[in-house]
Amino acid sequence: MQLGAFSVSLSVKDLAASRAFYEALGFSVTGGDPAQNWLVLRSNGTVIGLFQGMFEGNLLTFNPGWDQYRQELGQFQDVRELQDALDAQGIALTTRTDPDGQGTGYLQLADPDGNVILIDQHVERPKAR
């Protein structure tokens, strides 16, 4: 499976305090909107998202269609293909994407220890190969 770019999405209580903490560790803001309570920070190839009041717990996040620097890939495994592959393996999904969609989409699942995994596609389905 080609899951795409990886990041850790952290649920934070105080966006400004978390931003200052991660900047002290060498991360820089590369995206997001503080007015909407979220930021994306990067340190070399490591990406974290800070989200205040958007979800409970932390998420492992994959973005099909992007490389680690948010550059759109020409060919990639679409979120709907990933959903079909996970279904075929008998892996339970907690949130499903529209199987007939063409654009963006997301799905969620949890590993055996309850860690939530978000597969969140922000780009259009790739053209047929």
PLM ranges: what are they?
Residues 1-20, 122-129:
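N-terminal beta-strand motif that seeds the catalytic metal site of vicinal oxygen chelate
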Residues 13-16, 54-55, 62-116, 123:
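Vicinal oxygen chelate
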Residues 3, 36, 102-104:
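Loop/turn position at the start of each blade in beta-propeller repeats
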Residues 23-30, 91:
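Conserved acetyl-CoA-binding loop of GNAT-fold acetyltransferases
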Residues 28-70, 116-121:
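Conserved short beta-strand elements that form part of the metal-binding/catalytic scaffold
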